[in-house]
Amino acid sequence: MELVVEPLNLHLNAETGSTLLDVLRSNEVPISYSCMSGRCGTCRCRVIAGHLRDNGPETGRPQAGKGAYVLACQAVLTEDCTIEIPESDEIVVHPARIVKGTVTAIDEATHDIRRLRIKLAKPLEFSPGQYATVQFTPECVRPYSMAGLPSDAEMEFQIRAVPGGHVSNYVFNELSVGASVRISGPLGTAYLRRTHTGPMLCVGGGTGLAPVLSIVRGALESGMSYPIHLYFGVRSEQDIYDEERLHALAARFPNLKVNVVVATGPAGPGHRSGLVTDLIGRDLPNLAGWRLHPVWRSGHGRGPEPARCSPRHSTRAHPCRCVLSQRRLSEGTMRTQFNPRIPSHE
């Protein structure tokens, strides 16, 4: 049978029963993938014509047809098919692994946010903006975005206290320096596109600052010189953290503009009052033609929830973060499963 891959206009021979990812990899077609078990959502692609058998963990229909999004590692070929994959400048392949680590610091960032630092036994490569699952105990496992870069001496996660949250309660009240943890990843498609040339808009609220900080640092330290507009939104002055780090970056890199926005109560010196989305609308009234990277918000469930970028979305009820950069429009999602099957153990 034939598999057509757009926008590359490739015509590939394939065997019935093969997964899309197997066929793409065997033909050296560039596509991002990570866990290879249908959990991370990295190998997402779209069906243009034909049907596939979808074995994904969340699928509600075994046959996926025109317009459906599937995971290449879980979609099985049953007939001639045409698919669309992300453009090659968005490809990243960091095979997911399990790496042991040791907690080296648990710092109080705010009254309800802890900054967790972990020293890994072995390096873990990831792209800025990706996330990993952290296993504190067999019963305490959650996904968190990396706040740093793979070149950092330690891995950093920012964890917010969730009322009634089993894992955050453990982190705040039981976890101690010296504890052993397991890091599974990297996962996710909301990573920095390094080949992009154009301005970026980055928005983070609460612990949504973590992946935004990773992306902004990755962009700046790799030499990207176009304007980067960073908006950090909080409910009140007591929720602000990492401000010194943000302004230190802005002092080093003049193309970075930092806005700290306080939604309720008086704003302190150098801060702005109101909703982040309203201020963005006034500061940047025309975002036509800007490129949209995956957008998500931190919910109170098991993991990141997909979210749409809209003027009134999620600034108060949920921390949110988004990254936009000028040019084309693309869209991605992050999976909500918190315990992916990772093939290798270290």
UniProtKB/Swiss-Prot annotation:
It catalyses: 2 reduced [2Fe-2S]-[ferredoxin] + NAD(+) + H(+) = 2 oxidized [2Fe-2S]-[ferredoxin] + NADH. Keywords: 2Fe-2S, Aromatic hydrocarbons catabolism, FAD, Flavoprotein, Iron, Iron-sulfur, Metal-binding, NAD, Oxidoreductase. Residues 1-89 form the 2Fe-2S ferredoxin-type domain. [2Fe-2S] cluster binds at residues 35, 40, 43, 73. Binds 1 2Fe-2S cluster. Residues 96-193 form the FAD-binding FR-type domain. CDD domains: fer2, O2ase_reductase_like. GO terms for biological process: catabolic process. Its cofactor is [2Fe-2S] cluster; FAD. GO terms for molecular function: 2 iron, 2 sulfur cluster binding; FAD binding; ferredoxin-NAD+ reductase activity; metal ion binding. Its EC number is 1.18.1.3. InterPro entries: 2Fe-2S_ferredoxin-like_sf, 2Fe-2S_ferredoxin-type, 2Fe2S_fd_BS, Beta-grasp_dom_sf, Cbr1-like_FAD-bd_dom, FAD-bd_FR_type, FNR_nucleotide-bd, MRET. PANTHER family: NADH OXIDOREDUCTASE HCR, PROTEIN RFBI. Component of the 2,4-dinitrotoluene dioxygenase (DNTDO) multicomponent enzyme system which catalyzes the incorporation of both atoms of molecular oxygen into 2,4-dinitrotoluene (DNT) to form 4-methyl-5-nitrocatechol (MNC) and nitrite. Ferredoxin reductase catalyzes the transfer of electrons from NADH to ferredoxin (DntAb). Also able to convert naphthalene to cis-(1R,2S)-dihydroxy-1,2-dihydronaphthalene. The 2,4-dinitrotoluene dioxygenase (DNTDO) multicomponent enzyme system is composed of an electron transfer component and a dioxygenase component (iron sulfur protein (ISP)). The electron transfer component is composed of a ferredoxin reductase (DntAa) and a ferredoxin (DntAb), and the dioxygenase component is formed of a large alpha subunit (DntAc) and a small beta subunit (DntAd). This is 2,4-dinitrotoluene dioxygenase system ferredoxin--NAD(+), reductase component. It comes from Burkholderia sp. (strain RASC). The lineage of its organism: Bacteria, Pseudomonadati, Pseudomonadota, Betaproteobacteria, Burkholderiales.
